[in-house]
């Protein structure tokens, strides 16, 4: 049996409107991020910086009321910590690597990974060259996985993420 989970990466397609989440939930969407690589009405990105906005807080509240999971991939460090202050449910990073292994703003710090674990969430590492390291190969990908395993020895909060479109 195969299954899929519908996700929203960057809710620009519906004008970042929290009121539209219920409609999307009825359509089968269960995971939502707050943006992609640019600042938007909900939050700052890893490129632009900036925290969670009031509209972003409303978006998270509505998504979690519906039972949707928040994906923190692509957001700024400040927005990440703002989300951790307001979340009432597990948070995931569907495709974010370890910043300790590759110092890129898209990757998670050890403290961020620990916080995701505390919520009961999961971090899915990816194989996109820019986020893996200067010599991206299978060994370097494994370095991210092994680093997360040092922080979460049971591996309950680690997954293989997406972003395979960025793999060369």
Identify the role of each PLM range.
Residues 4-8, 32-34, 70-72, 91-94, ...:
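Hydrophobic faces of well-ordered beta-strands that scaffold small-molecule active sites
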């Amino acid at each position: 049996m195969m299954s899929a989970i519908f996700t929203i990466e960057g809710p620009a397609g519906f004008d970042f409107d929290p009121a539209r989440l219920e409609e999307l939930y009825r359509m089968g969407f269960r995971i939502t991020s707050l943006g992609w690589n640019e600042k938007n009405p909900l939050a700052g990105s890893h490129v632009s910086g900036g925290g969670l906005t009031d509209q972003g807080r409303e978006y998270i509240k509505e998504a979690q009321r519906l039972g949707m999971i928040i994906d923190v991939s692509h957001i700024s460090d400040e927005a990440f910590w703002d989300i951790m202050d307001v979340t009432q449910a597990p948070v995931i990073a569907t495709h974010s690597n370890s910043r300790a292994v590759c110092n890129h703003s898209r990757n998670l710090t050890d403290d961020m990974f620990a916080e995701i674990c505390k919520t009961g969430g999961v971090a899915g590492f990816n194989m996109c060259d820019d986020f893996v390291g200067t010599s991206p190969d299978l060994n370097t990908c494994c370095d991210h996985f092994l680093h997360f395993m040092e922080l979460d020895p049971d591996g309950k909060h680690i997954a293989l993420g997406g972003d395979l479109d960025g793999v060369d």
